[in-house]
Regions:
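Adenosine-phosphate binding glycine-rich loop
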Residues: 2, 10, 75, 80-83, ...
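Non-catalytic beta/alpha edge segments that cap or flank active sites
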Residues: 2-40, 52-56, 190-197
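Glycine-rich phosphate/diphosphate-binding loop of Rossmann-like nucleotide-binding domains
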Residues: 4-23, 31, 70-147
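Rossmann-fold NAD(P) dinucleotide-binding segment
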Residues: 143-157
């Protein structure tokens, strides 16, 4: 059996997984809704917000690094955005809000790139202070307070993974909305899946 299908794990009304399925179809990548390990699946993607328990994935199947160390697709595209699209200098101070899958390994990699980085949980009491001194804010918190929004410098670049800083869209120097990050995230996911399919094809050959 050829392993050339991306397994979708989560509620079938998941907006994220349905977007993945739609964009995968446009790129000629097969998808299937699954509830466990499935013959023919080369990789799996899950709606991590759904909180469904998962079986153990191999590193090869886990293209989004849900269970394994490494950059998630979202974290990878945010780094690409900072380095190449916006050409943000490395001497800028970055504040990462949240510690979940969306920003997985981002702190570690940014430190390797010589950024000054602060990271806090989405409920940190000192969040307003941390954002007030940041040049770049990467936000993955589901909600932020008015105090935090008010502390964001007008000169800042905000990369808004979750969308909870949307009120700042016309109040900061640069604002990257949730939809943009989401499109890049899915593009990176499908790129990784395509690599896995090609690797499987070489093995079968």
């Amino acid at each position: 059996m050829t392993n050339d299908t991306l397994g979708l794990y989560g509620p079938e009304d998941s907006r994220y997984l349905n977007l993945v399925a739609h964009r995968a179809e446009a790129k000629g990548i097969k998808t299937a809704w699954v509830d466990g390990p499935t013959p023919g699946c080369v990789a799996y993607v899950a709606d991590t917000d759904a909180g469904w328990p998962m079986w153990d994935l191999t590193p090869e199947e886990d293209v989004d690094n849900i269970q394994h160390p490494g950059l998630s697709c979202c974290a990878a595209v945010v780094l690409l955005c900072m380095r190449y699209i916006y050409s943000l200098p490395r001497d800028r101070r970055v504040c990462i809000i949240g510690r979940g899958h969306a920003v997985q390994w981002m702190y570690r990699v940014m430190r390797c790139y010589s950024y000054e980085v602060d990271q806090c949980s989405s409920t940190a009491l000192d969040m307003a202070y941390l954002v007030s001194r940041a040049d770049i804010i990467v936000n993955s918190a589901d909600a932020v307070t008015e105090e935090v929004l008010g502390a964001v410098p007008a000169s800042a670049t905000v990369i808004d993974i979750s969308g909870s800083m949307e009120p700042l869209s016309d109040r900061v120097a640069d604002y990257v909305p949730r939809d943009h990050v989401g499109r890049w995230n899915i593009a990176e996911l499908l790129r990784r899946v395509r690599v896995r399919i090609e690797e499987e094809g070489e093995t079968d050959g």
